[in-house]
Regions:
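Structural helix-boundary/capping segments
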Residues: 38-93
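Serine-dependent amide/ester hydrolase catalytic core
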Residues: 1-35, 39, 90-92
């Protein structure tokens, strides 16, 4: 029997909304930013930057120039050294 790993929205994808800064936006708008790197074949590295004020995880996508894979990874390492890292939620330490 298939079971979900976590609770998620099964509604029509075109009708889904996500709240950003108190404003409801179409869910698919967020994929635009990831698509910029994917569609142009640019290297990208995604890193966690820690939780927000509500404890939800936040991350950033570092997009580099063509063939700049090691540059995006290097910047991610620098940010991690400055304290931008994954913080396990309570109970998952």
């Amino acid at each position: 029997m298939a079971t979900p790993a976590f609770e998620h929205d099964h509604s029509d994808m075109g009708k889904r909304k996500i709240t950003i800064d108190g404003e409801e936006r179409p869910y698919w708008e967020q994929l635009f930013w990831a698509g910029m790197a994917v569609c142009s074949y640019l290297p990208s590295t995604v890193i966690p930057t820690g939780p927000n004020d509500e404890g939800l995880p936040i991350g950033v996508q570092i997009i580099g120039r063509q063939y700049g894979d090691l540059e995006t990874i290097g910047l991610a390492k620098l940010l991690e050294a400055e304290g931008y890292a994954f913080t396990p939620p309570p109970g998952y330490e």
